[in-house]
């Protein structure tokens, strides 16, 4: 008999599974799961609790990752068995990654308990180098909003312990009846 010790899911697969109800997962022995990954969109609190309780049995480490295709790999995430997860938080930057939070005036917010636009201070080995046949667009999209910083397009919160929570896109906003909505709210 072989047992899985880790599994990962994006928000849509998790929502589909959760919509089936708890009865769908009860017949399965998931006790071998030690690590559960979450990717794609930031996970909301209720989904995190469900994933933790129903799939992870309250014992699996939940690894909430933040990355983009353009970053070439995971940038912010807790490390299973090393750093504790916090519901809805990607938590800490991986070694060598130096995120920062910028305010709407282009100033870096250096204190904890901060909210603003997520940027990355310095290059890292897997960073995208350009957009095919459109290097000017690459520079405009990722490096023009905040001087000498990679602009992710995401908002974030940094809590009192320096953990990062991704709050959603700041550059994909819909205005509905006078309310600004990020796609994470829809």
Q: Which stretches of residues belong to each language-model region?
A:
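Single conserved hydrophobic/aromatic residue that forms the stacking wall/gate
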Residues: 1-8, 12, 184-185
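Hydrophobic alpha-helical segments, especially N-terminal targeting/anchoring helices
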Residues: 4, 102-103, 152, 158
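Conserved residues at the C-terminal ends of beta-strands
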Residues: 10, 39, 121
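Flexible loop/turn segments at secondary-structure boundaries
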Residues: 13-17, 43-46, 69-73, 108, ...
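Active-site glycine-centered loops adjacent to acidic/histidine catalytic or metal-binding residues
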Residues: 40, 67, 91, 154, ...
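Adenylate-forming AMP-binding core of the ANL superfamily, especially NRPS adenylation
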Residues: 42-45, 78, 84-133, 141-147
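Conserved ATP-binding/catalytic segment of the ANL
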Residues: 110, 119-180
């Amino acid at each position: 008999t072989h047992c899985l010790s880790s599994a990962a899911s994006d928000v849509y697969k998790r929502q589909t599974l959760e919509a089936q109800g708890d009865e769908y997962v009860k017949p399965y022995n998931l006790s071998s799961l030690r690590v559960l990954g979450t990717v794609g969109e930031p996970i909301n609190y209720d989904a995190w609790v469900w994933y933790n309780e129903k799939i992870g049995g309250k014992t699996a480490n939940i690894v909430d990752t933040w990355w983009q295709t353009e970053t070439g790999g995971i940038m912010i995430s807790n490390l299973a068995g090393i750093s504790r997860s916090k519901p809805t938080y990607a938590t800490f930057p991986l070694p060598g990654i130096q995120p920062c939070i910028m305010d709407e005036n282009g100033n870096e917010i250096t204190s904890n308990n901060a909210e603003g636009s997520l940027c990355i201070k310095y290059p890292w080995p897997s960073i995208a180098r350009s957009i095919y046949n459109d290097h000017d667009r690459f520079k405009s999209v990722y490096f023009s909003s905040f001087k000498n910083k990679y602009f992710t397009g995401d908002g974030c919160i940094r809590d009192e312990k320096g953990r990062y929570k991704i709050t959603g896109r700041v550059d994909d906003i819909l205005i509905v009846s006078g309310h600004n909505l990020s796609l994470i709210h829809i």
